[in-house]
């Protein structure tokens, strides 16, 4: 066909040959080969969508997956062996078992702590000096040697300014004018616990335990150090951000029936805790900053539903790409759903932001479903591989 010939012309190099790289890239773009089949970075991901008003899990997705029908009753042994040997690890639930540092998606925790403890107010500005030199081996802002200038907490969320949150983490660590690392860790964990990041979410399948930081409050304040959470745990956290402080215990079950269809037991999410000590002005500052994040990311351009969110990247292995993360909610003024998504070794959060935008298009019927599910893979461009938070 003409379209097929055009595609082939696009992937030929100057000599007229089709390189192996371009050939494979085109196959992936046209959904003829899946990332899981390649088992190259990135080839796995997860996404959790939640009703922020009730805590109901609307979707808890791990990729790659498999056909459970072929493993029920009479097990298809050949299929099982293929899955078992698959280098993309389809048996591993990336939504509930994979833990990584949350990266900058954690910054709303630090903002909550700084604002509530009186370290900063919504209008307090901090000058980004590039490198934070109040501690040994001072960490740098991602924009170093440039600077974000003098910004407040909402703008710091918008710009994902590491220096701003280093300073908040440092000030949270002060005891009688002296820097105390243990106290800083305690303060950060106090607020991450309020968001439910100290415990499992309650789902009835295998879930890894969250790990709160035990050291380095300066880098912990930007979601690094040894903070480590699953996607479903980040979902519970951002759901609480969206609804201004209600933390839910999740369930994956709806009801149990007998063989005649009679309901024996029903299941609903329950409220774990409410964050009554967080002021309305604090929520306003956080929500405003998250809205500005979306406004500065082109992945959300053209969406007719306003949303708010936070990007994040986390390095786990120096020889592999960063993990990419995104948490957010929509609509902005009257939230219905939250989203938490991670692409392991996904380079940067531009890729997860693109995924979140596609979820919004699907949920709010902003684009034809068949185009979203059966069209081409998104082409986020070279900018998606640039470090920006």
Task: Report each predicted region and the residues it spans.
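Beta-lactam-recognizing serine transpeptidase/beta-lactamase-like catalytic domain environment
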Residues: 5-8, 12-345, 384-389
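Long, highly charged amphipathic alpha-helices
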Residues: 187, 285, 354-358, 362
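Short, charged, low-complexity patches
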Residues: 234, 348-357
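Short, gly/Ser/Thr-rich active-site loops of penicillin-recognizing serine hydrolases
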Residues: 263-265, 270, 357-389
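Intrinsically disordered, low-complexity acidic/polar segments
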Residues: 336, 348-350, 366
């Amino acid at each position: 066909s003409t379209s097929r010939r055009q595609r082939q012309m696009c992937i030929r190099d100057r000599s007229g040959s089709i390189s192996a790289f371009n050939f494979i890239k085109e196959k992936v773009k046209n959904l003829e080969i899946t990332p899981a089949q390649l088992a190259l970075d990135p080839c796995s991901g997860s996404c959790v969508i939640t009703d922020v008003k009730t805590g109901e899990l609307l979707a808890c997705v791990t990729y790659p997956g498999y056909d459970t029908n072929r493993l029920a009753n009479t097990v298809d042994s050949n299929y099982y062996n293929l899955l078992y040997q698959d280098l993309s690890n389809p048996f591993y639930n990336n939504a509930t078992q994979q833990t990584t540092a949350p990266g900058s998606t954690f910054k709303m925790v630090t903002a909550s702590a700084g604002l509530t403890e009186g370290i900063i107010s919504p209008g307090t500005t901090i000058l980004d000096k590039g490198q934070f030199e109040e501690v040994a081996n001072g960490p740098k802002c991602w924009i170093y040697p440039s600077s974000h200038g003098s910004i407040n907490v909402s703008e710091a969320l918008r710009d994902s300014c590491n220096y701003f949150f280093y300073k908040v983490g440092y000030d949270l660590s002060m005891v009688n004018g002296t820097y105390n690392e243990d106290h800083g860790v305690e303060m950060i964990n106090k607020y991450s616990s309020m968001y439910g990041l100290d415990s499992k979410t309650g789902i009835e399948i295998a879930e890894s335990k969250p790990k709160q930081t035990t050291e380095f409050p300066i880098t912990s304040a930007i979601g690094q150090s040894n903070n480590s959470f699953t996607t479903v745990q980040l979902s519970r956290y951002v759901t609480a951000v969206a609804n201004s402080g209600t933390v839910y215990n999740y369930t994956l079950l709806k009801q149990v029936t007998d063989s005649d269809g009679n309901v024996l037991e029903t299941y609903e999410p329950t409220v774990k805790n409410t964050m009554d000590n967080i002021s309305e002005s604090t929520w306003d500052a956080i929500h405003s900053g998250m809205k500005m994040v979306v406004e500065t990311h082109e992945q959300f351009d053209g969406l007719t539903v306003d949303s708010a969110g936070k990007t994040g990247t986390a390095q786990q292995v120096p020889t592999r790409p960063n993990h990419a993360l995104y948490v957010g909610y929509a609509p902005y003024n009257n939230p219905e759903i939250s989203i938490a998504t991670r692409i392991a070794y996904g380079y940067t959060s531009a890729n997860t932001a693109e995924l979140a935008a596609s979820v919004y298009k699907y949920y709010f019927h902003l684009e034809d479903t068949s185009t979203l599910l059966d069209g081409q893979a998104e082409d986020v461009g070279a900018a998606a591989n640039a470090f920006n938070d």
